[in-house]
Amino acid sequence: MIRCGVLYAYAQASSASEYQVKAAFVYNFAKFVDWPPTVFANAQAPLNLCIVGIDLFGAALEVIKDKTIKDRKLVVQYKSRRENLDSCQSAFISASEREALALILGPLQDTPILTVSDVDGFLEAGGMINLITVANKIRFEVNLDAVRRAGLTISAQLLKLAAAVKGTP
């Protein structure tokens, strides 16, 4: 429950930059997701967060680099849309990739990679979590069908905090 409060506090933080808030969301999303055990090579394998496209986070990601999530070190990798994302457990698709969503998300359908973005139409394109702005606050919406097809599980606590959950509950 405390972790849920952290998400809410970050969403309200008026002094934090937009991408500092989004970095906190991306980090915290991973705390509330369970991946199939076969996704990781071994118990010590890191959790790889891939930034696809132009990195708009900048220094905001420095805060979450090398933290741990579920006893796994978080490693941030930077990828282009043409690169294979098989090494990623979570992928943030940058707004720079708006026109290439189908190209990026197509190969990821039914793959246990948590996809997150802040692009309009992301859920409709098959993405899993979309960051949105509601009343000047960063919120998020979830495509539960895409999450389930990928073999991932999202905590009910996180789903309760979502502005919208699309798909079959």
Show where each model-derived region lies:
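Short hydrophobic alpha-helices and adjacent helix-cap/hinge residues
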Residues: 1-169
